[in-house]
C-alpha cells in the first residue's frame, strides 16, 4: 500500500477535530478511497470522513487495509507539518504504518497499527428546514466569539439570512446574508431555530480550513449538520445533537 497526498495540512485539520471527539480512530482504506466514522463518548456528535482515491496524488491500494491510531499521538506527529508538504502513507505489513512528511526535510515515522473497533452507527434519515452555504472563515469567527460568552449557540434563519448568537453576561450575534457576501446560498422550507452546545462546535472548528464554504443544515430540535467539501471530491460531515431545554 502506498498513498501520497500533496497537502498534509488537510489531514492535520481533520486529526485536530478527531482529537476532541475520540481517543482512537480507524481509517478504513479501500481500493476506491478512505473512510472514517467516529462518535464521541457521550453520543452527542458524529464525524464522517470520505476521501475518494481521485483526490490523491498517488493511490495504490490493492486491497482493504484498516489503520487504527491514537488521535493524540497522530496530532503531535502532524503538529510540525508545513504548507505544501506531502504526506506519504505506506504499509508492507498489517502491524506498522510508515508515515513520511515530505518537504524541504523528510521526516519518517513508523506508527503502530492499533486495533480500533468501528462505531455502531444507527441509520438516520434527517430532514432539514434550512440548508445554507456559509463563508467558512466567517462561520469560524462567529463560533469562536460565541464560545467566549456563552455555552449555547442559538441559530435561526429565514428566507434571506442566517443568524447565530450566544447570550451570557454579554451577547454576541452574527448575521450571514447574501448582501454581505457571507451567505452564498440558502434552501428554505420554513423559518426555524434551534440550540446547540457551542463547545462541541468550537472543538471541530479546524475543519473550516478544508473548504471556503461550509454547508449548514438544521431544523427545530433536530441535529445540526455541517458539511465541508474539499478539492478533489473529499467530504467531511459533522452531526451535532440539539441542546434541548
Curated annotation (Swiss-Prot):
One of its GO terms (molecular function) is DNA polymerase processivity factor activity. It comes from the Archaea. Keywords: DNA replication, DNA-binding. Pfam families: PCNA_C, PCNA_N. Disulfide bonds: none annotated. GO terms for biological process: leading strand elongation; regulation of DNA replication. Homotrimer. The subunits circularize to form a toroid; DNA passes through its center. Replication factor C (RFC) is required to load the toroid on the DNA. NCBIfam families: pcna, PRK01115.1-3. Sliding clamp subunit that acts as a moving platform for DNA processing. Responsible for tethering the catalytic subunit of DNA polymerase and other proteins to DNA during high-speed replication. Belongs to the PCNA family. This is DNA polymerase sliding clamp 1. It comes from Sulfurisphaera ohwakuensis. The gene is pcn1.
Amino acid at each position: 500500500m502506498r498513498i501520497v497526498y500533496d497537502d498534509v495540512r488537510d489531514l492535520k485539520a481533520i486529526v485536530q477535530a478527531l482529537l476532541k471527539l475520540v481517543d482512537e480512530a480507524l481509517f478504513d482504506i479501500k481500493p476506491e478511497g478512505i473512510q472514517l466514522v467516529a462518535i464521541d463518548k457521550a453520543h452527542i456528535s458524529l464525524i464522517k470522513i470520505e476521501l475518494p482515491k481521485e483526490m490523491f496524488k498517488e493511490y495504490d491500494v490493492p486491497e482493504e487495509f484498516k489503520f487504527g491510531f491514537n488521535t493524540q499521538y497522530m496530532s503531535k506527529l502532524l503538529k510540525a507539518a508545513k504548507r505544501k508538504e506531502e504526506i506519504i502513507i505506506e504499509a508492507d505489513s498489517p502491524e506498522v504504518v510508515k508515515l513520511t512528511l515530505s518537504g524541504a526535510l523528510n521526516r519518517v515515522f513508523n506508527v503502530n497499527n492499533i486495533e480500533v473497533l468501528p462505531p455502531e452507527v444507527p441509520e438516520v434519515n434527517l430532514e432539514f428546514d434550512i440548508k445554507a452555504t456559509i463563508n467558512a472563515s466567517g462561520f469560524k469567527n462567529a463560533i469562536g466569539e460565541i464560545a467566549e460568552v456563552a455555552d449555547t449557540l442559538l441559530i435561526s434563519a429565514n428566507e434571506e439570512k442566517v443568524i447565530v448568537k450566544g447570550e451570557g453576561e454579554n451577547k454576541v450575534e452574527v448575521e450571514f446574508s447574501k448582501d454581505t457576501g457571507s451567505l452564498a446560498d440558502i434552501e428554505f422550507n420554513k423559518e426555524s431555530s434551534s440550540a446547540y452546545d457551542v463547545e462541541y462546535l468550537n472543538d471541530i472548528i479546524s475543519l473550516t480550513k478544508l473548504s471556503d464554504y461550509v454547508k449548514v443544515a438544521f431544523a427545530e430540535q433536530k441535529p445540526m449538520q455541517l458539511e465541508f467539501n474539499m478539492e478533489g471530491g473529499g467530504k467531511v460531515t459533522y452531526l451535532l445533537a440539539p441542546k434541548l431545554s
